[in-house]
Amino acid sequence: MFDLKSVSFVVPGEPQGKGRARIGKVGNFARMYTPAKTVAYEGLVALAAQDVMQGRDLIEGPVMIELRIVHGVPQSKSKKWKAEALAGLQPCTKKPDADNVLKAVCDALNGVVYKDDVQVTDGSFKRRWGDTPGVHVRIVPLCQ
């Protein structure tokens, strides 16, 4: 029997999106690499997930992922705007795009929570303003 308990954790700090692969030239050869900022953020996500996965096996079946992406309120905004943002009255349209945050999180969880992100069959996300930026992640194993 496999474990059907969900996995929940928080990735602290301002959310980061998955950066595009870059091309660098080494001699006469082109080389593709992932930007250092993306590698660092994926490492932070994996570390947060490892803390809650201690002693658990990797999820092998399909999963659903839920993200609550919380961006810090910009200091440059007025007190009124900040209050509205924290009350949910100002839409959160700050970069990075939610789909890029989702890609970064899904890729970082390969081999940590599940075997491969191809197992992610369902998902949802919400973007909000908040006092404490971070990404709240919940992985739910689905019955097969």
Task: State what each model feature region is.
Residues 1-144:
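Acidic, proline/glycine-enriched N-terminal capping motif
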